[in-house]
Regions:
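Intrinsically disordered, low-complexity segments enriched in small/polar residues
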Residues: 1-128
Length: 128
C-alpha cells in the first residue's frame, strides 16, 4: 500500500450524542486541518488528513472529537482516532476509542482506492 498522500475519512455517528471536532495533532507538532463538513453533525463528521506516510510529515498523530449529549450539557468525553504509519512496507495502523464511555464502541476500517488514496470509516455506536 502506498502510504503517501491523503487520508480521507468519515465518522458515522449512531448514538444520541453530538460529535464536535476538536483538533488533530501530528508527531511533527503540526495541526492537521479537518476538511469537509467540520461543523457538528448529528450524522457524523467528514475529514481529510493530508501528507500521511513514511515520506510525509504526518507519520503519527491523532484526531480528537468532543462528544456532547443532545441537551447541550458539558462534554461527556472524547473520541480519539489515531494513526501510525512508520514502516513503509506496512499499512497505516489505525485505532479509535472513546474515553470514559463504556456504553459506546468505535469500529474503524481503512480502504484503498484504485489510485492509492485511502478512506477511513469509523462507526460510533451504542452497545446494548
Amino acid at each position: 500500500m502506498d502510504l503517501q498522500g491523503y487520508l480521507s475519512g468519515r465518522i458515522v455517528n449512531r448514538t444520541h450524542y453530538t460529535l464536535t471536532p476538536v483538533n488533530c495533532v501530528t508527531d511533527s507538532g503540526g495541526r492537521v486541518a479537518l476538511g469537509g463538513a467540520i461543523e457538528p453533525l448529528k450524522e457524523g463528521i467528514v475529514f481529510t488528513i493530508s501528507d500521511i506516510g513514511t515520506s510525509g510529515v504526518h507519520k503519527r498523530g491523532q484526531c480528537m472529537f468532543a462528544i456532547y449529549d443532545d441537551f447541550g450539557a458539558d462534554t461527556l468525553s472524547r473520541l480519539i482516532v489515531q494513526w501510525d504509519s512508520v514502516e513503509s512496507n506496512e499499512p497505516v495502523n489505525l485505532s479509535a476509542w472513546i474515553e470514559g464511555r463504556e456504553s459506546a464502541e468505535v469500529v474503524c476500517s481503512l480502504e484503498s482506492g484504485e489510485r492509492g488514496q485511502r478512506f477511513l470509516t469509523c462507526v460510533v455506536d451504542c452497545k446494548h
